[in-house]
Amino acid sequence: MTSFSAPGSPVDTVLLTSPAGAGRTEAIRIFEDLGYLCLNHVWPELVPTFLKHYAPIAPRLVLCLASRPEADAQAGLIAARVALRSLARTTVHVHLDCPEGVLLSRYALTRRPHPWFDHGKGLLAAIRAERTALEPVRALADEVVDTGPLELAQLRVHLGALVGGRPTELPVTVMSFGFKRGVPADAQFVLDIRFLPNPYYESALKPLTGLDVGVAEYVFASEQSQATYRSLLEFLRFLLHQYRQDRRSQLLIAIGCTGGQHRSVAFVERLSGDLAAEGFACRPSHRDLAVNRLQELSR
């Protein structure tokens, strides 16, 4: 038997089994996002060979075992467990499953042939044949996950909690930019603060940036700026809590002013600091600041 990890402790290796259509591809993507090297459609008899090559270089490994009509699924799984036990890796066997009606409807939406399909018997017979062959495998699993009622976000939460050991914090970048050089193409949210008082028209502040205290004080001196900031902080606080629960992989929030030197820089610095203080993995970035400085020096 493989050794199931204690609750909350990290899992080195995941043995993943499932009938076709039960969510194997989505599960592999989730494990990849969690930092696992995923090997899909591995024949059980080849597990020792894969482990010999990949175990030394992959501290986190997912072996998704293939089910084939001509193979003994239970014998193959037991052989895979024996190979893993010899390496003393902390392993969990996860079996994905769902009702045959769900599998049938999922295959109705795809053009891919079922691996157990027999032209003389039809799709439902193929689904039933594979699930019957996998019943002994399902019985040996440490965790059986019914993907039928689960949305993708729920499956992500479930599998993440199952393997444990690594927080899935949402990395957030808050970026300043200037509209005159275009909007960042990879931003999920773009906020325009060009309506706020502009330090550019103050001769003493024009050569400075939003990183300078004088510029920041000017930007936030007006009630308009203060109200904007409070509303923006409250909105982002709500937004990040929602995305954190949805287990997004990353988020880029772009805040723009005309040149990306004064107002947006001051806002980004303050926002990223306040959000980081509340526990979000937030960092500031200033896309156009270096370009602006080079242009000033070249004049």
From Swiss-Prot:
Signal peptide boundaries: none
Residues bound to ATP: S18, P19, A20, G21, A22, G23, R24, T25
Key words, A-Z: ATP-binding, GTP-binding, Nucleotide-binding
InterPro entries: P-loop_NTPase (IPR027417), RapZ-like (IPR005337), RapZ-like_N (IPR053930), RapZ_C (IPR053931)
Domain of life: Bacteria
The keyword Nucleotide-binding is assigned to this record: yes
Gene Ontology molecular function: any one: GTP binding
Coiled coil: none
Similarity annotation: Belongs to the RapZ-like family.
PANTHER family registered for this protein in UniProt: RNASE ADAPTER PROTEIN RAPZ
Role description: Displays ATPase and GTPase activities.
Protein name (Swiss-Prot/TrEMBL): Nucleotide-binding protein glr4163
Organism: Gloeobacter violaceus (strain ATCC 29082 / PCC 7421)
